[in-house]
Amino acid sequence: MVCIPCIVIPVLLWIYKKFLEPYIYPLVSPFVSRIWPKKAIQESNDTNKGKVDCKGADMNGLPTKGPTEISDKKED
């Protein structure tokens, strides 16, 4: 059985997005743009962007140094 808020909240969000936001957003956006005038993310000209050094880790992200075996046996 699905809880009531799991049904009601998405419906209310859809109603807001479809009918209320076109009227509310133009009224609120000038105030928001005054509060946050700058862009949140600034691009950098880093040439190494996207290159990752994976030499110290195994394919699943575990370090390669030391034992990597995980036993399923319960130890007392």
Swiss-Prot record:
The keyword Cell membrane does not apply. Residues 45-76 are annotated as: Disordered. Keywords: Endoplasmic reticulum, Lipid droplet. Residues 1-37 are annotated as: Necessary for its localzation to the endoplasmic reticulum and lipid droplets. Belongs to the UPF0729 family. GO terms for cellular component: endoplasmic reticulum; lipid droplet. Undergoes ER-associated degradation (ERAD). May activate the NF-kappa-B signaling pathway. This is UPF0729 protein C18orf32 homolog. Residues 46-56 have a biased composition (Basic and acidic residues). It is found in: Endoplasmic reticulum; Lipid droplet. It holds the Pfam family DUF4512. Interacts with DERL1 and AMFR.
